[in-house]
Amino acid sequence: MPNRQLKFKWLRLLFIIVLFIGICFRVINIDKKVYWHDEAYTSLRIAGYTMKEFAQGAYAHPDSSIKYLQTFQQFKPGSQLRDTIHSLAVEDSQHPPLYYVLLRFWVELFGNHVTTIRSLSILFSFLAFPCMYWLCWELFQSPLVAWVAIALLAVSPVHVLFAQEARQYALWTVTILAASASLLRAMRLNTKWNWIAYAVTLSASLYTFFLSGLLAIGHGIYVFVIEKYRLSKKAIAYLFSWSLGFLIFVPWILSLIQNYSMFQMTTGWTNNSLSLFIFSRRWLLNLGHIFFDLGLEKDPEFMAIYFILLVLIVYAFYFLIRHAPLKVWLFVVTLIGATTLPLLLPDLIKGGQRSIVPRYLFPCYLGVQLAVAYLVSQKISKPKLFWQTIWQAIAVLLILGGIISCTISSQANTWWIKEISYSNPQVAAVLNRANRPLIIATNGCINNGNLLSLSYLLEPKVRLRLVDIAPLAQVPQNSGDTFIYGDCTEPVRDSITKKKGYKLEPILPYLWQLKSRD
């Protein structure tokens, strides 16, 4: 027994070192990666602007420096908190306001620099560590499982990437963990204040991201299965807490219903179908990126590693269900199943890509980490030295994979997480080298957010002409280089190529240069 206690102390020290490394990864180069489309929208919302106001302003200043767009990344004169909430409610109700309200206060206190804006997400990501420990203690009642889970979370590439995003997903991670731990504690102690605490954490999660509604469904399934489908005191207490949590969220539900057409418009892209090969590949990468991620260019070279990680994950769930008590494995399974199947099944039946959007999968990521943490902690505690050594090596490889991945991504100026803005650093480099550059961009699709993103990277000499998604009556005259930029520019490009004396040369994704045919 003394040897085992000494061994755990050494393991805990190693896990603390890994935790420190994970904290360092979250704060290193937080302003280096491109401030992308979605983050630019975050700044627009907290500034109190709507996208309608952005378009009106850009139309009113044709051929002005693209730096003019930075106006919409600063607080609107006279703007108040209600302007931020209104902007979200009428144009982007898929994003509840809790994170944006907190971020607005944060920026008012500490300034509007990219580093400052992203630092709030980093602080939220730090809170995930004690919440993970709390959840593991309530679920497994094992300090070793908790420390393994914290180590995996600390150097998880996907968690580190989202910790540096000016988006709500680090906060969502915290609220998922806190609500889940609160539920387990309330079921264990069954006191009024613990059930109220669950209601509060659940409503906080709902006000952070709307998919927390699926989390609540998973919790409900878990409670009623554990209570053997009886309306017991705990089941009644859960229903009360669930009702209270959703009652607090009702104002935003009403806002979402009132602006449902805009909600459909902003999430409609998730209905676009992908081939089965691409869909399966994205699922494989999403699961693999929990532990290993060398970037888009390197992913094809390491598909074997992702398949090995998939086998490990499948085995972790087999081991969990085979060896853990029902109340343990059922919680992990419902955490993943209730939040993933409602996204996956429509994709498989009707087509779409809801279930492969990484930011929608944080409950799944956390469930996978819980299962793997349980597997590793059980295996490295085995009495047989040979298997103990093998699994210690596997644990080291998992952590090293995360450290290597985070080391590489920390030095990059873009990553797959930047999605539609992935090429913006390259686009900016081309435009900044050009002679008196003029960008012609259409108003709509993904362009406005990407233009705001580019405004952080471009020199003041770059000018912008915002036009409708329609054929150009005439080509704008420019003594320097003229570029077409953005999605949904086909009508503009077609009208140019049909005019005598002009041609378009593809440069990068979403970027074409206007050339003379002479």
Task: Indicate where each model-derived feature is located.
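Hydrophobic/aromatic-rich transmembrane helices and adjacent perimembrane loops
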Residues: 330, 352-383
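Catalytic lumenal/periplasmic loop and adjoining terminal transmembrane helix
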Residues: 385-513
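Perimembrane helix-loop-helix junctions
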Residues: 182-198, 202, 214-246
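Transmembrane alpha-helix segments characteristic
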Residues: 202, 243-244, 307-312, 323-348, ...
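Transmembrane-helix motifs of polytopic, lipid-linked glycan transferases
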Residues: 119-140, 178, 318-319
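Transmembrane-helix signature of polytopic, membrane-embedded enzymes
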Residues: 132-155
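Interfacial juxtamembrane loops and adjacent helix segments
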Residues: 47-95, 99, 107-109
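Specific aromatic-rich, kink-prone transmembrane helix
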Residues: 105, 131, 151-155, 171-189, ...
